[in-house]
């Protein structure tokens, strides 16, 4: 009876180990957890949602070790923020391995919102199609976008080959 009812509502995030993550990052993660990922412009009035600013704040203010730890958080939105934050850090060296890890990280999908459209996708689809812009089958990159992530052509090809193995 009771155990079954309680276990059906269990969230893995309840027992997440926050050691090594500062309180202000934890507080922002807890708020960001249910907001999905936003391109920055949503809705009819093309407003920038607070979730976009929150995501940017976490990526900018979390340390490399905090972001690495957050790639293990049991929520797709937070994992995506952590992966993207590491990819965007110029000093982070293991980007290819990290992205390959993200490609195989399929347990938690995310909700991505852009313009008036929201859609569910895997973390890898968000990273490859809307952060890295390396798949020619994906939406075009924004005007003026350059690959500023330090990935060589062979690294991008390796990432793309692994990404294309995942059923969409």
Residue ranges and their predicted role:
Residues 6-80, 84-89, 96-168:
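Extended repeat-based scaffolds of very large eukaryotic assembly and lipid-transport proteins
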């Amino acid at each position: 009876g009771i155990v079954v009812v309680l276990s059906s509502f269990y969230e893995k995030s309840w027992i997440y180990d926050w050691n090594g993550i500062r309180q202000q990052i934890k507080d922002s993660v807890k708020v960001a957890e249910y907001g999905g990922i936003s391109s920055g412009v949503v809705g009819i009035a093309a407003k920038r949602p607070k979730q976009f600013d929150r995501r940017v704040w976490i990526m900018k203010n979390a340390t490399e070790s905090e972001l690495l730890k957050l790639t293990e958080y049991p929520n797709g939105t937070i994992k995506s923020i952590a992966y993207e934050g590491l990819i965007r850090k110029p000093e982070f060296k293991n980007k290819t391995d990290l992205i390959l890890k993200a490609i195989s990280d399929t347990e938690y999908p995310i909700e991505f919102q852009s313009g008036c459209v929201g859609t569910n996708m895997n973390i890898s689809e968000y990273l490859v199609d809307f952060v890295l812009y390396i798949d020619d089958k994906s939406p075009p990159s924004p005007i003026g976008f350059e690959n500023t992530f330090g990935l060589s052509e062979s690294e991008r090809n390796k990432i793309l080959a692994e990404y294309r193995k995942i059923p969409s």
